[in-house]
Amino acid sequence: MGIGFIQDKLEIKFLILYIAARVTEPLAPAEMQDLTMCDDGIDYFDYAECLNDLVKTEHLRLTEDGRYVITEKGLKNSQICESSLPYSVRQRSDKNIAAYNKEALRRAQVQSHVTERDNGTYTVTLALRDDVDELMELRLMVADRATADGLAQRFQQEPEKLYA
């Protein structure tokens, strides 16, 4: 394990709760790991053990689709213990969480979906939403799956090109 500001498993648990309390949506296992491994003092095996312990003690729970979400108990303990985290770790975590939340907001606002039709063609649905309502929805018929997937992916990457 590298030298870092996180010194023990209790601090890893505090960090996991700190992160879970600040994200805007439940986290997939890989996302939780990416956000937690922000300090050289954390190794994967300690992280995995701490994450499992937090689920067992009902500070976190797993959703039906395998994502982690903080419970009321976890939120309460996170608020009590967050000042125990080293300041530099909190700063780095806040930066990473802000970037994650920004990307999550974009995923919620820019959506695309491909469905196969009965005749073998595909419908690509492209939608833009804001916090309140749907701004735009466009459905396009395309001949093959590759074209449909490409169109959906390009819209996800640069929706402003279509909307402008």
Short names for language-model regions:
Residues E25-T36:
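Short acidic, hydrophobic short linear motifs in intrinsically disordered regions
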